[in-house]
């Protein structure tokens, strides 16, 4: 069977038959919704601009719908799956549907949040239908741990997509927006209808594209130091930064001094700041004197 034949991919009947054979029911606990439409997974691969020399990491492959479409386009695919049954079944599905590409597939049976290394060449792309309940932490963790990932396309709940791609001043701009922007240029890349999933979710889905920054943000502060400011600023997002950062700085006057030194108004709110401005604040964290 050629990997370019339409029946190499999984359709609705294939998905349901495979699930029945395995005794699998998608669980809300793990945020699982399986994609049952071959056109949709091919669209995701096209939108992700997967190249023939790419090593793609996929998180939460499920029954393998997107995995097979990625194998059509990429050099290698590494799938990370936490579910015991799904992890055991996926290599056999790849072997059965795309035997000539099976040697280009690797499975890591693990929680993606615990993965610190992947087999084979360093990944160049992340393409995934992320489980909705862990989408943001998984995305940020993968971008942190695998700096070789240049391009990312993830399918997430629509409101999460909005948050990730939001710009300063937008009402949904927040912690995910800033942290994602630390690593990459982020934008919405389309919408996905509910009817391409089984079971059909109660929410809409969206695609988010992240292209890693060619140059890291120019700052002497570490990622952890910058993210600490971001977390503090949005923990009390309705407060001014002078008040919201008082715990981080040690006091409100100390927060004001750090803000002024960074060129930021103490009366501003976190939702107005760019990631570069958060980095500037982190550089001016007051020294805590030990008595």
UniProtKB/Swiss-Prot annotation:
It is found in: Cytoplasm. One of its GO terms (molecular function) is 16S rRNA (adenine(1518)-N(6)/adenine(1519)-N(6))-dimethyltransferase activity. Keywords: Cytoplasm, Methyltransferase, RNA-binding, rRNA processing, S-adenosyl-L-methionine, Transferase. Pfam families: RrnaAD. SMART domains: rADc (SM00650). S-adenosyl-L-methionine binds at residues 33, 35, 60, 81, 111, 129. GO terms for cellular component: cytosol. The keyword Methyltransferase applies. Its EC number is 2.1.1.182. The keyword DNA damage does not apply. It catalyses: adenosine(1518)/adenosine(1519) in 16S rRNA + 4 S-adenosyl-L-methionine = N(6)-dimethyladenosine(1518)/N(6)-dimethyladenosine(1519) in 16S rRNA + 4 S-adenosyl-L-homocysteine + 4 H(+). It is an enzyme of class 2 (transferase). Its main location: cytoplasm. Specifically dimethylates two adjacent adenosines (A1518 and A1519) in the loop of a conserved hairpin near the 3'-end of 16S rRNA in the 30S particle. May play a critical role in biogenesis of 30S subunits. HAMAP family: 16SrRNA_methyltr_A. Belongs to the class I-like SAM-binding methyltransferase superfamily. rRNA adenine N(6)-methyltransferase family. RsmA subfamily. This is Ribosomal RNA small subunit methyltransferase A. It comes from Streptomyces griseus subsp. griseus (strain JCM 4626 / CBS 651.72 / NBRC 13350 / KCC S-0626 / ISP 5235).
């Amino acid at each position: 069977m050629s990997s370019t034949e339409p029946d190499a991919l999984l359709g609705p009947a294939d998905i349901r038959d495979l699930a029945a054979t395995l005794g699998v029911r998608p669980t809300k606990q793990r945020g699982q919704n399986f994609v049952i439409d071959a056109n949709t997974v091919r669209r995701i691969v096209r939108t992700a601009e997967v190249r023939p020399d790419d090593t793609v990491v996929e998180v939460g492959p499920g029954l393998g719908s997107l995995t097979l479409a990625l194998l059509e386009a990429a050099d290698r695919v590494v799938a990370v799956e936490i579910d015991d049954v799904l992890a055991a079944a996926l290599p056999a599905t790849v072997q059965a549907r795309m035997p000539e590409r099976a040697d280009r597939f690797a499975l890591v049976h693990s929680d993606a949040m615990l993965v610190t290394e992947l087999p084979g060449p360093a990944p160049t792309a992340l393409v995934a239908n992320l489980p909705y309940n862990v989408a943001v932490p998984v995305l940020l963790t993968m971008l942190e741990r695998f700096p070789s990932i240049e391009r990312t396309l993830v399918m997430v709940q629509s409101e999460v997509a909005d948050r990730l791609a939001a710009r300063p001043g937008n009402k949904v701009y927040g912690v995910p927006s800033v942290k994602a922007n630390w690593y990459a240029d982020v934008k919405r890349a389309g919408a996905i209808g509910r009817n391409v999933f089984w079971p059909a979710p109660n929410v809409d889905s969206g695609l988010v594209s992240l292209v890693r920054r060619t140059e890291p943000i120019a700052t002497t502060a570490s990622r952890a130091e910058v993210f600490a400011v971001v977390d503090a600023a949005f923990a009390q997002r309705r407060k001014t930064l002078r008040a919201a950062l008082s715990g981080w700085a040690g006091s409100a006057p100390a927060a004001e001094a750090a803000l002024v030194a960074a060129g930021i108004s103490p009366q501003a709110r976190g939702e107005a700041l760019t990631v570069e401005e958060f980095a500037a604040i982190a550089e001016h964290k007051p020294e805590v004197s030990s008595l």
